[in-house]
Structure formats: C-alpha cells, structure tokens
Amino acid sequence: MAKDPQTPTDEELARAERDAEPQPGDATDDEVELEGVVEDVEASEADAEALENPEADALAARVEELEQALADAKDQTARAAAEAQNVRRRAEQDVEKARKFALEKFVKELLPVVDSLEKALESMQEGASEVHREGVSMTLKLQLDVLAKFGVEAVDPQGEPFDPQVHEAMTMVPNPEVEPNTVIEVMQKGYLLNGRLVRPAMVVVSQAAN
C-alpha cells in the first residue's frame, strides 16, 4: 500500500522561501551582465581618451613653437641691449679721450716756448735788468698757469730714481755719492697731459763707480 506524500511543515516552507530570496552579497545574472557592460563602456572611454587627437597635437606643437620663439626673442633683446650698452660705453670713452687729449698737439707746440723762457730766465746774469727778469718770469708763470688749467703738469725728476716710463736717459755718469740709476741732472723737463705722457724728461743718470 503506497504511502501518502507528507505535507511540508510551516518551518520547511519558510526555509525554502529564504533560500529562494537573493542574498545581499550574491549577484544575479542580470547584475553580472550589467556590470560587464559598464566595464566595457569605461574601457572604451579610456581607450578613446588615449587615442591621439590630431588637432590637440597640432595645437600643442604650435604652443611649443611660440614659447621657443618667445624665448629666442627675449634672448635677442637681451643681447641687443648689452651690445647697445657696450657701444654707448665705448662712445663715452672715445669722447672722454678726445676731450682729454685734443690739446696734445697744441701743447707740444707750446712746450718749446716754455723751454725758451726757462732758459732765458736761468741765463740772465745778476746784473741784468730786474724789469727784464720780472717780465720773463711773469710770462713764464702765465704760460705754465694756462697749461696747468688744461691738465698739463711738468715732470722734473731731479734726485729721483730713473723711470723709463717717463724719463729718457741721455747719458750715464759714475757718481759714488748717490745710488745707481738716480737722476742727477734734468736737461729738459718732461710733461704730462691729464696723466698721459706728452714728452719724457731728458735726464742724466748715475751709475755705480768702477
């Protein structure tokens, strides 16, 4: 005799319903499929962004070109400014030199007059007219004052060490009383114009005695 099927209890029915409900941590087939589609879309977008954009590349290249041109222009401007400053400085130096030494030729022409006046004053005997002596002396002083006004100064190295930069040795004489290479006589004074030698002093220089 066949047995009647057993009727499920309420507890068994509740358990079966719980098992049939999806759990929070479990994904359904539809959800899994949807997630796959989303991932594919995101990957496609990333790939699209990674693809080269010809217009963007051209724009970036143009920007780089302009930046380089700007840097070159700044460099050229700086170089031009430096060159202009150098030119201006050289021009100022040339003007200063011209101002200082424009009188050099004229001074050289006047120096023989000064030499003549000095020799005339030295050669006058004590019995010479005081008026004449005073006249020559005043003329010489006036001449020297004018030269000094324009930056001319005499080189009178009597008793000083011989300096070939500003002295010209006419002869050397043994002299045990002074150090060798000492100027013992000035035959003709030298002159400087604003610190530049116009004429060396002609001198006699001592040398060691034999």
UniProtKB/Swiss-Prot annotation:
Primary site of residence: cytoplasm
Region named Disordered: 1-31
Signal sequence residues: none
Biological process per Gene Ontology, one example term: protein folding
Matches recorded under SUPFAM superfamilies: Coiled-coil domain of nucleotide exchange factor GrpE, Head domain of nucleotide exchange factor GrpE
Record field: compositional bias (Basic and acidic residues): 12-21
GO terms assigned for molecular function: adenyl-nucleotide exchange factor activity; protein homodimerization activity; protein-folding chaperone binding; unfolded protein binding
Cellular component GO terms, alphabetical: cytosol
UniProt subcellular location: Cytoplasm
Source organism superkingdom: Bacteria
Record carries keyword Isomerase: no
Pfam families for this protein: GrpE
InterPro entries linked: GrpE, GrpE_coiled_coil, GrpE_head
Entry's family note: Belongs to the GrpE family.
Record's subunit section: Homodimer.
Function: Participates actively in the response to hyperosmotic and heat shock by preventing the aggregation of stress-denatured proteins, in association with DnaK and GrpE. It is the nucleotide exchange factor for DnaK and may function as a thermosensor. Unfolded proteins bind initially to DnaJ; upon interaction with the DnaJ-bound protein, DnaK hydrolyzes its bound ATP, resulting in the formation of a stable complex. GrpE releases ADP from DnaK; ATP binding to DnaK triggers the release of the substrate protein, thus completing the reaction cycle.
NCBIfam families linked to this entry: PRK14139.1, PRK14140.1, PRK14150.1
Protein name, UniProt field: Protein GrpE
